[in-house]
Amino acid sequence: MSHNRAKMHFLSKIILKLLKKSSLKKLSSSPNSAIGGSIKIGDFCNFSFYPNAKKISIGSGFSIRNYCNILVSNNAELHIGNNVFMNNYCSINCLEKIEIGENTLFGEGVKLYDHNHQYSASPDFKVEHQKFNSAPIKIGKNCWLGSNVIVLKGVTIGDNVIIGAGCVIHKDIPSNSMIINKQEHIVKNL
């Protein structure tokens, strides 16, 4: 039984290597892309670059851990600076433009959305599945976004910003700031 287990372990390592090579090929084969050196890609990452993406640039020293997703739609731009680190389960969803400054760190589960679904309230409430409103996201350099931070469309985050875990960012944040999510509010005493 241990021989079979060793074979399976060996095969799974080969499959993971092939998946990583495929991910790197996707990154570098996009016609409007510029990719720096020393890029590290974790396991089970997904890159969806539409054929008519306007521009994709990823700086040197980019490191992305496991189970991350990056989507860049047609006519969209993604710019990632040098030495950016994304931890496990991060997601970038770019329909217009997202910029991430150099030396920025993402904790686990960080999500960036430069768009939201269009909807109408009358005569009947309806959310559109394939129609979106979008606005660029810009994250400065030397930032740290804690675990499970969500950044919504139209936000600019300055340089040297720390955002605590679990924050939903829907407004601009000036440089040299720290944002925390206060959750000490007691709803009911038992």
Listing of model-derived features with the role each one plays in the protein:
Residues 155, 167, 173:
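Short beta-to-alpha loop/turn elements within the nucleotide-binding domains of ABC transporters
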Residues 112-121:
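Proline-centered turn/helix-capping motifs that create local helix->coil transitions or kinks
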Residues 163:
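Binuclear metal-ion centers of metallo-dependent hydrolases, dominated by the metallo-beta-lactamase
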Residues 120-130:
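Short glycine/proline- and charge-enriched loop/turn segments
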Residues 1-113, 134-145, 149, 159, ...:
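Domain-scale signature associated with acetyltransferase and cell-envelope carbohydrate enzymes
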Residues 128, 133, 169, 175:
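Glycine-rich, flexible loop/turn motifs
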Residues 96, 153, 171:
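Conserved coupling/switch loop of ABC ATPases
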